[in-house]
Regions:
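Bacterial N-terminal signal peptides that target proteins for export
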Residues: 1-8
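Soluble extramembrane regions of membrane proteins in the secretory/endomembrane system
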Residues: 22-194
Length: 194
């Protein structure tokens, strides 16, 4: 376990060094997200982002391990990350379920330790965790899709065909919410993608 974390830290430092090579010592501001997503987590992220700017950080690293939480706060966190002036990276140290998946997809790069999971973003209601009506699922699918699409796409010409290649596949993001979306090689039509 310690070796895996050490390898990740070394890889991340190399990634930041290559990206921000003009700085001899890039400043990485780490924000831990290791509880359910809610109003406290949202305020914690806002404070961390302000502190990163005040300390002239080069980027933010979210260290994430969450089973999810409130869609409302997750949407606020997603929007803040998408609009933030510094790059925001996420290291998933076990779980980025549900609301955590939405937040992770908003980040500039996603890093995961071996055996970590991301996905299972179906909206649930009440204490029993039953699936919310399709109105809510539709909105969450749209949010996941738009977040993935926000990272852009490349136009590739192959054998006189023009292909669109998404940097983050919006269908994969939607499949984390809707079991009817099939991603070849990942999930069948009876499973939510994780």
């Amino acid at each position: 376990m310690k070796n895996i974390r050490l390898i990740f830290v070394l890889f991340f430092i190399l990634f930041v060094y290559v990206t921000y090579g003009q700085h001899s010592n890039p400043l990485i501001y780490k924000i831990n997200i290791k509880e359910n997503i809610g109003s406290n987590t949202w305020v914690y992220l806002q404070n961390g982002m302000h502190q990163a700017l005040n300390k002239n950080a080069d980027c933010i690293l979210l260290h994430m391990n969450t089973y999810g939480g409130s869609v409302t706060e997750a949407d606020s966190m997603r929007t803040a990350i998408l609009n933030f002036q510094l790059p925001v990276y996420v290291f998933i140290d076990n779980n980025a379920a549900s609301a955590g998946a939405l937040i992770s997809i908003a980040c500039d790069s996603i890093f995961m330790r071996s055996a970590a999971s991301i996905g299972a973003a179906t909206v649930v209601s009440g204490q029993d965790g039953s699936k919310a009506p399709d109105k809510y699922q539709s909105y969450m699918r749209g949010m996941m899709r738009a977040t993935a699409e926000s990272h852009g796409r490349d136009t590739v010409i192959q054998n006189r065909d023009t292909l669109i290649e998404w940097k983050r596949d919006p269908k994969v993001a939607e499949a984390m919410v809707d079991e009817k979306i099939v991603i070849p090689g990942f999930a069948d039509s009876t499973q939510i993608l994780t």
